[in-house]
Amino acid sequence: MAPTAVYTQKDSPSSSQPSSKGPALAIGSLETAQDGKYQSLITELEATRQVDKLLLDRLVDGATTLEPSKYNSVHVTLASSDYQSLQESTLRSLLTQLLTGLTPLGTLHLLNLTDGLKTLPSELTLSGFLVLSAAGENPGDSIVAQKPAHAIGASVSLKKRGSATTTSTTAFVTTTTTTSTSTTTATVTSAPSVPLLLRKRGDPAKKKALWALTTDASASPSTKIDADALLTAEDKARPVPTCAPVDRSAPRRKKACKNCSCGLAELEEEEKRNAPVVVIDSSIDGEGGAKAVDKAERERLLEAAKNAPKATSSCGSCFLGDAFRCAGCPYLGLPAFKPGEKVEIDFGMDDF
C-alpha cells in the first residue's frame, strides 16, 4: 500500500486579492494637479489600497458630500494659497465633513503645509480630531490627525453585576483541508464577553452617620439640640432703638424719628420757630405783594387778623380759590383762604 501524503492548504498571495488597507480618499486642487503633486499622491496610494479622488472645490462649494464612515484615511495635498483661503473662510466646515467621512480611528493627512498655518492644530482639535503629529517649522511638513474611536455623544450601556452577558461573540475558525479525502474540519471558539460593572454603592448607615448631630455612640439617634437653650435672657431681650446724638455740622437725617432721643426733634422745632415768614398782602404794590416778616411781626399780624372784621369781596368768590376768581382779582394765584385771615407762605415751601 502506497503512503498517502497530507497537504495543508495555505493562502498564497495573488494580485487579484484586495489590499489589507482600507479605502482612502485623495483630495487635491487645481494647482497641485498642475504641478504633479496630486498625481504623485494618487500613484503612491493606489499601490496599497483603493483610492477615491476628489477636488477641493467640490467639498467647499457643497457640490458633493462624503459618505459617513467610509474611508480609513484621507490625504489632502494643497498649495499654500489654497490653505490660506481655507483658513480665512471654510476650514471648520471642511474639517467637519472629513471627520464624518472617516471611520473610527481613521487618519487625516494634511500635506505640503506652510509656516503660516499656526492655528491649524487647534482647529483640528475643535473639530473633533486627535492631533497625532504636528507640523514643524519647515515648509512642506505634514500634520496627521485621527478620528476618535467613539463619536461625540455616543452611548455605551452599563450593566450591573450579575446581569446577563452580551449575546454577540467573535468566532475564530481554523480550517484544515486534505487532498485525499477533501474533508474540512472547522473549530469555532467564542470569545468571552466582559461586562462593564457600575461602582458599588456605599453603606447607607455610614453615609447617614456623617450627617449625625452627635458623635457619641451612647447617645440616642433622635437626640437633637434645643436652639432656645443656647440663648440667654439678654439675647432674648428686645433691643431698645437708640441713635447717635445729632451733629449740626454733619449731614442730618430727613426727619426725626418717633420718640426721638438724639435731639433732632428739638432742633427741628427750634428751626421752625425761628424760620422767616413771608406774608402775602393785597395792599402791597396794589396787586398782592409779598414781604418777609420776623417772628414778632408775624404774631402781631395773626392777632390783628383774628380781631379784624371779616373781609368782603365784590364778587364773593375771592376766598374760594383761582377757579372762582376773575382776571383782575388781587388774590389771583393765592390758595383758598377764609375771609379776614392772612395767607402765610413759608420760605421752605416748594410752590413759592
Swiss-Prot record:
Pfam families: CIAPIN1, DRE2_N
Region (Fe-S binding site A) location: 243-262
UniProt feature, compositional bias: Polar residues: 1-11
Motif (Cx2C motif 2): 326-329
BP terms from Gene Ontology: iron-sulfur cluster assembly
Principal localisation: cytoplasm
Annotated segments matching region N-terminal SAM-like domain: 1-196
Entry GO CC: mitochondrial intermembrane space
Renumbered residue ranges of the record's region Fe-S binding site B: 315-329
One example GO MF annotation: electron transfer activity
Chain positions of motif Cx2C motif 1: 315-318
UniProt-annotated stretches for the region Linker: 196-237
Similarity comment: Belongs to the anamorsin family.
Protein name as it appears in the record: Fe-S cluster assembly protein DRE2
Natural source organism: Coprinopsis cinerea (strain Okayama-7 / 130 / ATCC MYA-4618 / FGSC 9003) (Inky cap fungus)
